Design a protein with these regions (language model features):
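Aromatic-lined substrate-binding rim segments of carbohydrate-active enzymes
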Residues: 1-70, 194-211
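Structural preference for beta-strand elements that scaffold enzyme active sites
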Residues: 5-7, 38-42, 112-118, 213-217, ...
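Active-site-proximal loop/turn and secondary-structure-junction residues that shape catalytic pockets
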Residues: 12, 47-49, 121-123, 222-224, ...
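Extracytoplasmic/secreted cell-surface and envelope-processing proteins
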Residues: 15-18, 51-53, 126, 226, ...
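Alpha-helical scaffolding within the catalytic cores
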Residues: 26-29, 100, 233-245, 262-267
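Catalytic-core region of carbohydrate-active enzymes that cleave or remodel glycosidic bonds
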Residues: 39, 203-214, 241-275
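Aromatic- and carboxylate-enriched substrate-binding clefts and catalytic-loop regions
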Residues: 46, 129-133, 137, 265, ...
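Polysaccharide-binding and catalytic clefts of secreted carbohydrate-active enzymes
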Residues: 68-242
Length: 275
């Protein structure tokens, strides 16, 4: 086919099977094989989330619910989705990610076989549009972050049409809780979660770039076939949420929609914004 780049998963559970003990043999092998075949690599960090779920987190992480809490449904049921509101989750995920970036820098900063990193994989909430854990509820009922209100004001005439219409239909307020600013529905839940997922990713990228400055991107599971948030992985970097992601995670270099449906041109056109 003449392709010259391969996308290779970097599995957290295989890299750190025991807490604090790292094994990069599969990373080394992938880079070795790529060089032999004159290929470049984009590593996909399967860390806290892969296709919404935390299926590639290590067992020591999965088994410690108290230290590494999961998101919860509205009825309080825990999901196998690590909470983006937990500092312990972030610290464990980012520590392993930084170790990966350090290792790549040590073995590849001259040859540059690795050209880009995907941070997490198809982030998003399932079953519900947002997390209903105690910390999530506290933040949901708090005022919008100043950074977001400033962005809304500054970019009012250039927002994605969906976000602008939703905001204006709720009254166009600048100050208030998430529901006071965006209205009381499932899509406000999604906006809220998008902010905190994007904020988490921004911190991950900043941590990784401190040790090795590679381009980094995030991919998105699409909201096709008329599904509602939670029926698809809600709050990922979808077109209608692009302003939220741009504001909370300005360090992301690319947003990459995962397209399994027809209509590539139509899907990608939805991402077109002034910035």
């Amino acid at each position: 086919m003449g392709l010259n780049i391969v996308l290779v998963p970097a599995y957290w559970d295989l890299i750190e099977p025991q807490e604090g003990k790292f094994n990069f043999s599969l990373i080394d092998k992938a880079i070795e094989q790529a060089r032999k075949n004159e290929l470049k690599i984009i590593f996909l960090w399967f860390g806290a989330w892969k296709n919404s779920m935390s299926c590639y987190a290590p067992m020591w992480f999965k088994n410690n619910y108290k230290k590494y809490p999961r998101t919860r449904t509205e009825t309080g049921k825990p999901l196998e989705i690590a909470s983006p509101f937990s500092e312990n989750v972030f610290q464990a995920d980012s520590k392993a990610f930084v170790k990966l970036m350090q290792h790549i820098a040590q073995i590849d900063s001259t040859e540059h076989t690795v050209i880009m990193i995907q941070v997490e994989n198809e982030i998003g909430m399932l079953e519900n549009a947002r997390d209903y854990s105690e910390e999530a509820n506290r933040l949901f009922n708090s005022k919008l972050p100043d950074k977001l209100t400033t962005y809304l004001q500054k970019n009012k005439k250039q927002l994605h049409p969906w976000l602008y219409d939703k905001w204006q239909q709720a009254g166009g307020k600048i100050k208030g809780t998430w529901q006071e600013v965006f209205g009381k529905d499932i899509y406000t839940d999604e906006i809220f979660m998008a902010w905190y997922y994007a904020s988490y990713v921004e911190r991950m990228i900043q941590c990784g770039r401190k040790v090795y400055n590679l381009p980094m991107y995030v991919n998105a599971a699409m909201n096709s076939r008329g599904r509602k948030p939670g029926e698809y992985p809600a709050a990922g970097p979808l077109a209608h949420l692009i302003d939220i992601w741009h504001c909370a995670a300005p360090s992301i270099d690319l947003l990459a929609p995962d397209l399994y449906d027809k209509g590539f041109t139509d899907w990608t056109a939805q991402y077109k914004l002034h910035n």
